[in-house]
């Protein structure tokens, strides 16, 4: 076997011969030879050979079988070489394997029995251990419950004992009735003594101790619920709690009336210990805040001498601020002391603001009504200022956030219906502009009003400016609704732009004028000059001082917000500027319509030279002089010189002259075209007559044609027209329509040179 391994190289390392590359591989077989049949369970060698001998020679079959045998031998050798090490090791272990198995079986069975027995012992010990631990746990739980019950009993007894001590303390000598809240009737002489102050402080310290014990008692009760012992003690606990609340309330009121800082500290810590902050806040509200607020905010049904409503709150807030600074500041400072644990109290919201809200709702409910926008805004801003004053007593930003999140603060802000207020202001401002824009004609501002109108001329423009300014007036704008007023501002600008553009489009389409568009139908060119002037003034104001005023008012906002506002206002100014080209085009149309009235005389040129013997014309037609007269008169008029910019005047001049020239050229080209067609037809008729008559015509072909005379007349006219255009400051050669006109009527030798 070793020789076989040594002499048989691995298939992967054996060199391949040329036969492997250029001839059939070793394992290739003819189609009739199928080695897979040898593996069939029903294979019979004799029948297999007998079947093949009928069509395969015996030598060929033998050669193929030997070749297949050699291939199988090679595969067997490769298999042995691949797993030789494992094969040898396995052969050494297989010697007397049965006897070895018998010898190993007995120890293994013995070991299994020992392991099974040990496992049973361990499980029994584990079960016993678990039972012991469970019993210990149950005993510990029972001991804990017992200790809890004992502690509860001791605490209840201790609380009752301390409460019994309370009536015997010297501080109760000032009040015979333990259930009375009338601490204000105490003997001032005794309450100012040093011993009396010490007694109050001693009682407050004792109450703080009782509150601490009550806090422990609540903890015990929370961990021992539904136990009969606890249920039996509930009455005692409840009675102690009621007595504690009553005594603590008396002591707290006494401390408030006497401004005793130590007593207030102790009482507030006691309230915080028993988690009853609402009681302290309510006592402070009813005892200190409510009496004063009721004196300030009283029923008033008349109006003062100035005619203002008595629902105004500004004066009331001033008195309340003075009261807070004088009588409430001490308690507010105590409750906001750093690291005192008293931040759980919110006297600002639940005592002061709560009482103020209730008083306003009861006595002055009209203060919350947005039906009177001016009074509403005044009260709203006064209330915001009052809230800011209260927030000034908050020691930190988190305290301010907590104050704003209080339910009473949220309820207070809900009373101010800013949405309805804005709707009323919207109707007021937008209605004023809409009323001005629905006028059937342009309304001019009187001279006495021009100083306050930014040099505006039209009442419609002045109304727009006043409405825009009203949106951001101090007595109109609500900062929380600034986004809505910004939207209203943009809507006002858009409404004015639509008023101008829709009227101009209506005039252009010659449709029946809709409401607000009648003014454009009857307006003159000078009227449109006023509109252009006002639009330019409005754009300058909106994108200048007006935008600066808005940015200054919103200076507390973020940069992103200011950028959005600036872009929005600038876009509103752009919407106004977009109507300027429409206005300019309308003025051009008005001027052109006046100018082209003289072009009707152009048709007379045909009658002048048709079927006549007139010589070539040598001077221009009279109508040419009047073509540009409306343009010149308009641009040199006072309205254009005073209210139009140089750029606008240049646009009007160029646009008017170009349009007049275009119409002039179209009409002249039509006249020339008709004349040439007529001449061509007449010439054909003459030629036909000559052919029929056989004689020469009496008319010489060398004479100047009627069409040439017309073109010469038009050429003289266009030269004069060009001189008039030059007099206005334009170059005729720069006008495409003029160049086309020149080439249409100029003689052949002057087609390429325009000279006037």
Curated annotation (Swiss-Prot):
Residues 62-82 form a coiled coil. It holds the Pfam family COG2_C. Residues 173-199 are annotated as: Disordered. The keyword Coiled coil applies. It is a peripheral membrane protein. Its main location: Golgi. InterPro entries: COG2, COG_complex_COG2_C, COG_su2_N. One of its GO terms (cellular component) is cytoplasmic vesicle. The keyword Signal does not apply. GO terms for biological process: Golgi organization; protein transport; regulation of exocyst localization. It is found in: Golgi apparatus membrane. One of its GO terms (molecular function) is protein homodimerization activity. It comes from the Eukaryota. Keywords: Coiled coil, Golgi apparatus, Membrane, Protein transport, Transport. PANTHER family: CONSERVED OLIGOMERIC GOLGI COMPLEX COMPONENT 2, CONSERVED OLIGOMERIC GOLGI COMPLEX SUBUNIT 2. Homodimer. Component of the conserved oligomeric Golgi complex which is composed of eight different subunits and is required for normal Golgi morphology and localization. Binds to COG3 and COG4. Interacts with FPP3/VETH1 and FPP2/VETH2; this interaction promotes the association between cortical microtubules and EXO70A1. Binds to SEC15B, and, possibly, with EXO70A1, SEC3A and SEC10A. Required for normal Golgi morphology and function. Ensures, when in complex with FPP3/VETH1 and FPP2/VETH2, the correct secondary cell wall (SCW) deposition pattern by recruiting exocyst components to cortical microtubules in xylem cells during secondary cell wall deposition. Belongs to the COG2 family. This is Conserved oligomeric Golgi complex subunit 2. It comes from Arabidopsis thaliana. The gene is COG2.
């Amino acid at each position: 076997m070793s020789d076989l391994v040594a002499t048989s190289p691995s298939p992967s390392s054996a060199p391949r011969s040329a036969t492997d590359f250029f001839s059939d591989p070793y394992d290739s077989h003819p189609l009739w030879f199928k080695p897979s049949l040898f593996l069939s369970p029903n294979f019979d060698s004799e029948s297999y050979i007998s079947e093949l001998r009928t069509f395969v020679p015996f030598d060929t079959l033998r050669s193929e079988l030997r070749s297949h045998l050699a291939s199988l031998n090679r595969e067997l050798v490769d298999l042995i070489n691949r797993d030789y090490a494992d094969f040898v090791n396995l052969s050494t272990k297989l010697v007397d394997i049965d006897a070895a198995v018998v010898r190993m079986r007995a120890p293994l069975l013995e070991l299994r029995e020992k392991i099974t027995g040990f496992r049973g012992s361990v499980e029994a010990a584990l079960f016993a251990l678990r039972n012991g631990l469970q019993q210990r746990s149950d005993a510990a739980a029972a001991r804990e419950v017992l200790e809890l019950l004992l502690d509860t009993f001791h605490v209840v007894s201790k609380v009752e004992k301390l409460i019994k001590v309370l009536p015997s303390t010297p501080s109760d000598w000032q009040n015979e009735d333990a259930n009375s809240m009338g601490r204000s009737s105490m003997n001032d002489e005794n309450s100012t003594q040093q011993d009396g102050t010490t007694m109050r402080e001693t009682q407050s310290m004792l109450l703080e101790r009782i509150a601490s014990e009550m806090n422990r008692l609540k903890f015990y009760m929370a961990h021992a619920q539904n136990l009969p012992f606890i249920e039996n003690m509930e009455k005692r606990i409840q009675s102690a709690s009621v007595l504690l609340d009553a005594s603590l309330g008396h002591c707290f009121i006494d401390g408030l009336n006497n401004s005793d800082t130590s007593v207030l500290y102790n009482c507030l810590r006691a309230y915080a210990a028993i988690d009853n902050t609402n009681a302290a806040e309510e006592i402070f509200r009813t005892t200190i805040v409510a009496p004063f607020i009721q004196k300030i905010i009283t029923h008033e049904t008349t109006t003062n001498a100035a005619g203002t409503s008595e629902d105004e709150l500004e004066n009331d807030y001033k008195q309340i601020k003075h009261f807070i600074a004088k009588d409430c500041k001490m308690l507010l400072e105590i409750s906001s002391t750093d690291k005192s644990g008293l931040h759980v109290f919110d006297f600002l919201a639940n005592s002061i603001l709560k009482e103020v809200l209730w008083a306003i709702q009861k006595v002055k409910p009209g203060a919350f009504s947005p039906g009177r926008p001016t009074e509403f805004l005044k009260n709203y801003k006064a209330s915001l200022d009052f809230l800011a004053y209260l927030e000034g007593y908050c020691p930190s930003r988190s305290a301010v956030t907590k104050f704003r999140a209080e339910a009473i603060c949220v309820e207070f802000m809900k009373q101010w219906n800013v949405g309805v207020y804005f709707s009323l202001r919207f109707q007021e401002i937008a209605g004023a502009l809409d009323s001005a824009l629905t006028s059937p004609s342009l309304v001019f501002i009187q001279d006495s009003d021009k100083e306050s109108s930014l040099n505006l001329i039209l009442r419609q423009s002045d109304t727009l400016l006043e409405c825009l300014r009203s949106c951001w007036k101090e007595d109109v704008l609500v900062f929380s609704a600034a986004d809505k007023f910004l939207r209203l501002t943009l809507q006002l600008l858009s409404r004015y732009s639509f008023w101008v553009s829709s009227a101009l489009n209506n005039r252009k389409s010659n449709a029946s004028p809709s409401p607000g568009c009648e003014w454009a139908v009857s307006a003159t060119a000078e009227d449109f000059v006023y509109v252009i002037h006002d639009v330019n003034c409005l754009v300058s104001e909106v994108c200048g001082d007006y935008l600066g005023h808005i940015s200054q008012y919103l200076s507390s906002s973020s940069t992103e917000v200011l950028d959005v506002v600036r872009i929005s206002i600038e876009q509103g100014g752009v919407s106004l500027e977009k109507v300027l080209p429409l206005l300019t085009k309308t003025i051009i149309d008005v001027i052109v319509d006046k100018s082209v009235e003289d072009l009707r005389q152009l048709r007379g040129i045909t009658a002048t030279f048709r079927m006549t013997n007139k010589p070539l014309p040598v001077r221009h037609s009279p109508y040419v002089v009047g073509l540009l007269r409306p343009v010149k008169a308009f641009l040199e008029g006072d309205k254009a010189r005073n209210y139009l910019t140089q750029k606008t005047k240049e646009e009007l001049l160029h646009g008017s002259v170009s349009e007049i020239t275009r119409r002039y050229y179209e009409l002249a080209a039509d006249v020339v075209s008709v004349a040439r067609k007529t001449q061509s037809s007449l010439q054909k008729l003459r030629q036909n007559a000559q052919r029929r008559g056989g004689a020469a015509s009496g008319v010489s072909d060398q004479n100047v044609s009627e069409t040439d005379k017309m073109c010469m007349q038009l050429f003289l006219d266009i030269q004069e027209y060009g001189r008039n255009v030059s007099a206005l400051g334009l170059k005729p050669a720069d006008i495409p329509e003029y160049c086309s006109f020149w080439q249409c009527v100029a003689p052949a030798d002057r087609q390429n040179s325009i000279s006037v």
